UniProtKB/Swiss-Prot annotation:
This is Adenylate kinase. Its EC number is 2.7.4.3. The keyword Nucleotide-binding applies. Keywords: ATP-binding, Cytoplasm, Kinase, Nucleotide biosynthesis, Nucleotide-binding, Transferase. ATP binds at residues 10-15, 123, 132-133, 200. Pathway: Purine metabolism; AMP biosynthesis via salvage pathway; AMP from ADP: step 1/1. Disulfide bonds: none annotated. InterPro entries: Adenyl_kin_sub, Adenylat/UMP-CMP_kin, Adenylat_kinase_CS, Adenylate_kinase_lid-dom, P-loop_NTPase. Residues 30-59 are annotated as: NMP. Gene3D superfamilies: P-loop containing nucleotide triphosphate hydrolases. Residues 122-159 are annotated as: LID. Its main location: cytoplasm. GO terms for cellular component: cytoplasm.
Length: 215
């Protein structure tokens, strides 16, 4: 099963990715992890990517696609794989098809922006331990204080409303193009497109996704 998982930041993609990979016995592949592994291994593409990153540049699509092809040729991908956060752009999606990397399914976890903003902007974190609270759904015993240590909880910059809204705008801009691209593919290249309501309880989202994927 070769799956591309789409979902805005805060849509619950990480949780569902774990369920999908466990159900099908496939690895989760993210370009960030792949880049770090290739750089650590001293692979030629990894070294080329490191040079670009060190100079403050964006790694070119041809390098990313090359790494993806190498990664999915490994033994643990024989039953398939789950792409997380890749392809991000139309150019990457087109290059993947041209490189012969087809998908069985594109799964989009759909959550309204207002819900995402509420989920993320309400998060509060205890930096030293990583413990998280939510002002509405999981409030601390004392407002603004960690339950265990009594130390301050903070709102990360990434979770501030303005930042979340900007990230959502970028996500929609990129994803709409991808959804359009995959829905128009025909024949053997055409993946099944599955859109799931991500505002449901976690177990309901899991059941709907796995059911649609034939599990």
């Amino acid at each position: 099963m070769k799956v591309l998982l789409l979902g805005a930041p805060g849509a619950g993609k990480g949780t569902q990715a774990q369920f999908i990979t466990a159900a099908f016995g496939i690895p989760q592949i993210s370009t960030g992890d792949m880049l770090r592994a290739a750089i650590k291994a001293g692979a030629p593409l990894g070294l080329e990517a490191k040079k670009i990153i060190d100079e403050g540049g964006l790694v070119r699509d041809d390098i990313i696609i090359g790494m993806v092809k190498e990664r999915i040729a490994q033994d643990d991908c024989k039953n398939g794989f789950l792409f997380d956060g890749f392809p991000r752009t139309l150019a990457q999606a087109e290059a993947m098809v041209e490189a012969g990397v087809d998908l069985d399914a594109v799964v989009e976890i759909d959550v309204p922006d207002s819900v995402i903003v509420d989920r993320m902007s309400g998060r509060r974190v205890h930096l030293a331990s990583g413990r998280t609270h939510h002002v509405t759904y999981n409030p601390p015993k004392v407002e603004g204080k960690d339950d265990v240590t009594g130390e301050d909880l903070i709102q990360r910059d990434d979770d501030k409303e303005e930042t979340v809204k900007k990230r959502l705008a970028v996500y929609h801009e990129q994803t709409e193009v991808l959804v359009d691209f995959y829905s128009k593919l025909e024949g053997e290249h055409a993946p099944k497109y599955i859109k799931v309501d991500g505002t449901q309880p976690v177990e309901a989202v899991k059941a709907e996704i796995l059911g649609a994927l034939g599990k």
